[in-house]
Amino acid sequence: MASSSPMFNDHAIARSKYALNSVLQQTNELHDGNGGGGYTPSSPHLGGVSLNKSQNQPYTQYNNGGGGGGGGGGHINPMHLNLNSITNNHNNHHNHHPNTLSTPHNNNHNNNNHSTSHHPHSNSVANGGHLSQSITQQRGGLADLANAVINRKNRSDSVQTKMKPTDSASNIESWAKVEKFSSSIFDSEKSKKSNIFQKYTLRLKNSYEKGYLHQHYNSQIMLLRITNLIGIVAVSYGFTKEAIFMLIAIRILCFNLFAFSIFLSFLRNRELYKKLFHPLFLFSFTTFFITILLEYKTTTTTLILFLYVVIFCCLYALGCLLFIWMVMCNLMNAICFIIFIFLESTLDRNNLISFVIYILTMFLVGASHLYVLEKFRKESFIAEKKLIKESNILKNEKEKSSKLLNNILPDFIIENIVYDFEKRDIVIPEPEEYKSCSILCFDIVQFTNMSAKLDSPSRLVDLLTQVFREFDTVVLRNGCQKIKTDGDAYICACGLKSKKKAKKQMPNSKSTPLLQSTSSTSVNNIDLDKDNKDNNNNNNNNKNSNNNFKNKNNIINNNNNSNSNNNNNNNSNNNNINNSGNDDDDEEIEDSELEHFEKLIDVAIEIMNLDVLKETGNTEGIQVQFRCGIAAGSVYGGVIGSQKYQFDIWGDTIARSHTLEQLGQPGKVHVGETIMTHKNWLKKWQYNYNIVSNSECKDQEHDYEFHKAHGECITSYFVDWKDDYREKKKKDLSCDFSINKVLNAETIESKSNNNNYNNNNYNNNNYNNNYNNNNLNNNSNNNNNEYGSSSSSSSVLGEAVTEQIDCNNTNPPLQHKKSQSILTNNENDIVSPSLTSNSPILDTTVNNNNNNNNTNNNNKNQNNIYGNNNNNEEDFKIKSKSNSSFEIEMSNIKKPKSRFIDRVMGILHHVKISNDKIDKEIIQIDEDFVKVTKLRKYFLFFENLTTEKFFHKYVIINNVVETKFFLVIGLILHLMFYLDDHIMDSAPYFNSNVIYLVMGIAFLVYIGLSFTRIFRTPLVYQIAFFILLCAFGVCTVLELIRFQNPLARSSLTRVCATLFYLNVFHSLNFLSVLFLNLFIFSFFIICSILISPTLTNHLYETDYIGFVIVLLIQICSSYGMKLAMRKAWVVNCKINFKTISVNKEKDKFNFLLKSIFPQSALTKLRDMIDTPNIETKGIVYVQPHQDVSIMFIQIAGFQEYDEPKDLIKKLNDIFSFFDGLLNQKYGGTVEKIKTIGNTYMAVSGLDGSPSFLEKMSDFALDVKAYTNSVAISRVVRIGISHGPLVAGCIGISRAKFDVWGDTANTASRMQSNAQDNEIMVTHSVYERLNKLFYFDDEKEILVKGKGKMVTHVLKGKKDLEQTNKWFTKPPEVWEVNATPAGIASPLSGTLLGEIGSFTTPRFHLSS
């Protein structure tokens, strides 16, 4: 390749008629043996084939011989593409195309289409292949695929407004839990017998039982204390009465037990009481009941019965003991009571039976109530645990998606991506134009020779991994953005600023933003532009103030700043705190391109000097040389296609950058004249950079082909650091890494500790801090050095000002291990006495000649040193036992730590910021859920009536068995009341037999109806059971109204049991239960006063007190139980809601993986996303394959004056069709790798399919047939090869699936040598497929880097049993009659401007 390095004039290009269509810059250009492009710039190309109006190529042999790199992209060197590059010979194209569309657009060409000329050679089978020969049968499939593509082409038309939500909190039906639990929460891993025991004793699995006991204890601790305190009061009251010695001894024992329980509950270490409170409670209340029996054995036994019922009604209702312990307590007291009445009382047999009935009734109703209550409690506990687990899973899935997307696509693309849950598809925003940016392109020199030195593709990939990882670090550190790597090519940019705003989810939308943009500190070029702007503002601000630290990117800019006012720092510092910059807006816009360019120059020079490029710097021991080119201007950027998403850029700027790279020299930074002649260039950069004109440009001044491609030729330049500036930059970098090496370890440790402390929340204040950072409204104008140092600079006036931190004089203690202790928050750490304000690294003052200014500015600079970055800085402020000035100075160390680590290690993968964003998203989900499930706590009613409806459905369905059981209990209770009346021969006031009969029938009817679905309706259930319980209470009161009322206390006991029974129906609304309790209580009082006035004569004050206590406790217990039930349901629904969200997040994640990576790599990549070192090493996945096939498809034939945006849209439609064809017909075997400009790359055989090569050939024929039948204004050139290669992903950012190896290089060369509508294959492919496909005779071509190669042209498939059996050889002539077949071409409107229709091809064999 010629060594001359011409540069084209930007203004000349703008005037050139070829400028519009230069947006598709990336072509399939090959490297020559010296690493140069395989095509001379004198002949513009699209996809490696010259498409000038004149098909005469003076460098044809040179073009065909392009040697090249070995990689999935190294073999494809993205190159420039001007108008000529995408324009075919207009007449030639239409005169030789075998098929035409009968559309108004083509009428001028199709009026005489019956007489269309046809050429018998390569174009004679332009529609060749099995698909073309059977186009009549297969065109429907193509049309279907095209329809699928056309439905997706309008990517900017979000589907949000077309659908209702399926996963939002407002759609209650989607998450409201009404079904029963799928499995019992009491199952264990033990035997079935053990499961039965655990099920009926409500014992959880061992892993949960301990946790529930802990929660139960903490929730009941106050109630236990109050209960024990009441026991102490009751026992103390007994001491006021005379008693026998045994009673006094038991009371003393009971008093001590209650007191000991209270004492244990107030100990700091409550573990002992947590273990003992159940047996202590059981024993203490049993002894207390024994004291009651002994005290009242000489009184009426009915009082003891009443007290027994009151005590256990309260204990069962409160549920302060676990079910099994409460049952044991009741059994022990019941046994003691029964023994007492049989041994000590003088009751007759009927009374004894009556007492036993009441005792059993209390036990039966109480135990069943507590069983259901505890079951709900434990289900709620398990639900809360499951909710935490689901929340963590949801967060992890979101983190995976976030890491994956942010590693592949820029934030301003991610925030506009929408996931359509209904169609299970992703809506990608259309590419947009970025008006002002700079592009830097790298390419390895002599990559073919370098690859030959490595004995395996794996070693090549290892080398590229090491090199590009260092590239990524440099690019990120300088605030730029990596675009992509294509094999040995590396492309980055600065200044990509999206004008699109993130799409927000519509209220009625099934589509949701895939991942919202992270916080404003994330590394995307929106923020980087802000930094650029701030850096530019800083240039002017520094005229009046000396900052402690300068931004690294301002080192160059500050050289020419006037420091004449340096001595006025005392006033100017304060004046500039609230300034937003004094630069004129026009000047900022004008200079923004310079800021981008400056950063990329620093990046390029720094990369050229990396140690990894030296023989001793990489593990392979190979010197790696790069060429690079930098250009500034506008580009189009975005994502095209429907699979294997990748961000790419197109346009004249990238084309010029590639051309500069091609025409450059190894190890030198090559730029054009336009940016160098900018009015501020020399003023800003001449003192720091060596600028050398490329004198060899004159060789190209009279090259017609070059001018035709690129416009006028003007001088280009090589840029490098000056020696003194280079040394200072080295100091800066060494200081950066020496500091950040320590800080990085501390950051990781602090983040790890913080994550271990709380997996769900990220504490932004990891360190306690006494430093009061004033809230200054400093809009980053005083932009400080993000690396903790700056370089001295010379002003135009020759006045030297030193504003640096000398890394060479860094105090040794900072480099010693002990010095790391000052960066931690450990109180035992020792602070080195040498680390004081005199330490150069800790010095925050400006070392100018005015010492007074240093003193005056010190405190002010301490306040404004971080500008408006207060939030980030709080993370790393240090707590110290020393004086406050030391604390402030120590806080200044954190600047390089936070800026560097957050940018390089944190922001890119959003380690902390993304997690905070995900936390906010989850919190937002919770907040939305809370709004829908908002509860009126005083009335226990959901504000949302739909939510209330689903809650009652849930409770009813989950309590079907309990409802039946409690109806049976009610019937038994009613029978016991009847037996009691019958045994006691009571004389009721009303005819009780009729009342008992009616209620008995009612219970039987309800029991029968409970086996139907009639009670499943919430309203029916509420009304029916309200009527039943109201009738039961009224009947019970009427039944116990007797003449003379000899059993007044037993009647009161029966009313207490009735009130208790009203509360066991958990499905009944609280307001209904409250009304029933108050109604029955009032009705009993009214009846006892009005109907049976003598009843009150048999009751005492203690009876009334006990009765009221039972009523209040029942109401409170019912409120608490139903509130807990509602909370438990909300938790279960939240689990259901988050489970749905998790599943959808998994769907999105899996869809993303499938849309970006081949199926064969998904499993390993899923695991890799979770690895800790992905934050520092990125995605590193490499897999060698011994035999796979590679294909390159180049699209050409675009119109001469198409707008760039239209060209990209047309390519998007074509590539989306290819994606759909692969997905529908060849999914799993043939995989898309990527698109490079107008070239589509695919691989076959990664899944190990034995027919991979045949399927690849079928796909090539399908693509060719599609292009010639649907997109007839296009031509394709296809190349196929097969052999070994390495596939995988490498890089810290923008890591995409790619392949490397000579097989890919060979396929690229096949494509570059193919003619229009040809499928060129290697001889090895021919040998494998000659029995299945038709091929042309072999042809020997000269390929640079490979020598002479035997190739073949694939024509069609022999096996046509499904189509035309009469074919015995490939057809030589196609005749197509323009008879409309009525099959619409969905893509024709996009590709040709209007809707067209297929013509019916009729094939005739020529003699």
Swiss-Prot record:
User: Where is this chain compositionally biased, Gly residues type?
Assistant: 64-75
Query: One GO molecular-function annotation for this sequence?
Result: ATP binding
Q: Does the keyword Translocase apply?
A: no
Provide GO CC annotations from the record.
cell periphery; cell trailing edge; cytoplasmic vesicle; extracellular vesicle; intracellular vesicle; multivesicular body; plasma membrane; uropod membrane
Q: Which residues lie on this side of the membrane: Cytoplasmic?
A: 1-219, 374-962, 1399-1407
Ranges for the Guanylate cyclase domain? 438-661, 1189-1311
Q: What is the effect of changing residue 649 to T?
A: In temperature-sensitive mutant tsaca2
Query: Family, per the entry?
Result: Belongs to the adenylyl cyclase class-4/guanylyl cyclase family.
Q: What does this protein do?
A: Coordinates cell aggregation by synthesizing the cAMP that influences differentiation and morphogenesis of cells within a developing multicellular structure.
UniProt name for this protein: Adenylate cyclase, aggregation specific
User: Which species?
Assistant: Dictyostelium discoideum (Social amoeba)
